[in-house]
């Protein structure tokens, strides 16, 4: 795919994994990464979700547009999408990580989108689910973002991985 959705997130995950390995960071809990190529049609993470998974973060993108809070300079944290609301406690945890680590963020609602996290929930996974990512303009068109949004999303992903499970 030529789109930043979702090559940007995959690149940030690979960068995070390299950092964890190179810096020999000890994570407070087991983290599994699942990269899907079917998220856009709702098949993403609807199978093979271990019953040991407690929290499920979809690391995707924040769609920019008229009526949206998201922008291309911050990390976008989703409160609700077309599938319904995301787990409030987990959303609050993400917001608190941003505040504590001085990560610029926006909270948004995406009425026309869903994510791998909502697909896992619909498939019956008993999880706390959340969604965040870099703010990206013109999803699936001539996409663009700002490096500040990439850094904010990377920093929240890193902070989340080092935080305890709620």
Where are these regions (language model features)?
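Acidic/histidine-rich catalytic neighborhood of metal-dependent amide-processing enzymes
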Residues: 1-80, 113, 117
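Active-site-adjacent substrate-binding region
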Residues: 75-166
């Amino acid at each position: 795919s030529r789109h930043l959705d979702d090559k940007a997130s995959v690149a940030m995950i690979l960068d995070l994994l390299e950092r964890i390995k190179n810096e020999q960071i000890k994570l407070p809990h087991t983290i599994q990464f699942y990269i899907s190529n079917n998220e856009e049609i709702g098949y993403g993470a609807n199978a093979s979700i271990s019953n040991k998974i407690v929290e499920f973060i979809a690391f995707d993108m924040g769609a920019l547009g008229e009526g949206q809070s998201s922008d291309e300079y911050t990390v976008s944290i989703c409160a609700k999408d077309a599938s319904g609301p995301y787990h409030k406690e987990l959303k609050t945890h993400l917001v608190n990580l941003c505040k504590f680590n001085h990560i610029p963020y926006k909270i948004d609602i995406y009425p026309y989108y869903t994510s791998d996290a909502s697909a896992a929930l619909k498939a019956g996974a008993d999880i706390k689910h959340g969604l965040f990512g870099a703010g990206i303009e013109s999803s699936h068109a001539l996409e663009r973002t700002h490096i500040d949004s990439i850094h904010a999303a990377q920093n929240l992903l890193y902070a989340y991985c080092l935080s305890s499970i709620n």
